[in-house]
């Protein structure tokens, strides 16, 4: 949570430095029933502890003054005015360009099938389908396959690092619907995540989703009729005027959910120089700038830069 807060604080300045689109649009977490007041208050208290600035608990009247298209079936909401949105593709490309300018070389389209470290030395050898590489540091940021990469190196997978592919299906709506909300609209979270959100994009569309489906197929990025119907149904709980006729495309992606229910970012005690950066699901994008700095410090413990 603290990584999220600090990463969010830095995003505006980073967008100017690296030239990607960022908007400070704020967010609302909706409470539909008065009986959920304690849960909303707990979310507010957690935000205060983690240093989220200017949080407010709003009445339904205050919410509707800000967002008139929000459901009337509302008991209140948590407002975070510091929240923002980015273009995730633009951010990723900007970071990659910056890395390239600083000497990073990209090697695409290769599957890692073996990693070994010298018994008496500090050098790793990494075999892929195309090449063999040598390195003093290996950073395991392999997403849904991070547990498999860890097992190649250590021979085991810690329980907290076991990865489940959690599919999220989204619908992208036409720009004619972009006016329906200004803020990013969440629902009170459950153990499966933040529920279905409704948010404007930096390009003026409306994005609705995601689902949270734990699946066995770590390549299962297909959409399903049931999943997309659920996106509209649950999204309409927040914004009743959502219409499937305004959907211009749908897609899905996989979050790398760790069984430890948290990011798994640490150096491996058994194999010095091997660093796991795993289980990075939401809010991983917001945390990315701070995660990068934290991992750089782990690298510096083993490498003189």
Named regions from a protein language model:
Residues 2-5, 30-39, 78-97, 107, ...:
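Short beta-strand to alpha-helix junction loop
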Residues 9, 19-22, 132-133, 141-273, ...:
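Active-site substrate-recognition segment that forms the wall
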Residues 24, 59, 108-110, 128, ...:
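Short loop/edge segments at beta-strand edges and connector loops
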Residues 30, 112-115, 198-200, 265:
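A structural signal for short hydrophobic beta-strand segments in well-ordered beta-sheet cores
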């Amino acid at each position: 949570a603290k990584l999220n807060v600090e990463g969010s604080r830095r995003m505006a300045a980073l967008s100017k430095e690296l030239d990607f689109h960022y908007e400070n649009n704020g967010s609302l977490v909706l409470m539909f029933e008065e009986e959920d007041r304690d849960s909303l208050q707990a979310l507010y208290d957690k935000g205060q502890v983690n240093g989220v600035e200017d949080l407010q608990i709003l009445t339904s009247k205050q919410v509707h003054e800000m967002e008139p298209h929000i459901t009337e079936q509302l008991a209140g909401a948590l407002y975070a005015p510091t929240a923002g949105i980015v273009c995730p593709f633009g951010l990723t490309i900007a970071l990659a360009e910056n890395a390239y300018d600083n000497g990073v070389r990209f090697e695409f389209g290769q599957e890692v099938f073996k990693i070994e470290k010298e018994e008496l030395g500090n050098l790793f050898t990494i075999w892929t389908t195309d090449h063999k590489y040598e390195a003093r540091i290996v950073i395991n940021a392999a997403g849904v396959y991070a547990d498999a990469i860890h097992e190649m190196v250590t021979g085991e997978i810690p329980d907290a690092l076991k990865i489940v592919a959690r599919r999220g299906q989204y619908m992208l709506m036409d720009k004619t619907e972009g006016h329906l909300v200004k803020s990013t609209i969440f629902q009170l979270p459950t153990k499966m995540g933040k529920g279905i959100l409704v948010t404007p994009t930096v390009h003026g569309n409306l994005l609705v989703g995601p689902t949270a489906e734990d699946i066995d197929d770590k390549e299962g990025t297909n959409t399903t009729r049931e999943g997309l119907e659920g996106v509209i149904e649950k999204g309409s709980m927040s914004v009743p005027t959502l219409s499937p006729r305004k959907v211009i495309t749908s897609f899905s992606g996989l979050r790398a959910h760790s069984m430890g229910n948290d990011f798994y970012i640490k150096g491996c005690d058994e194999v010095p120089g091997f660093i796991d950066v795993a289980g990075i699901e939401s809010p991983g994008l917001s945390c990315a700038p701070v995660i990068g700095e934290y991992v750089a410090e782990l690298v510096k413990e083993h490498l003189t830069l």
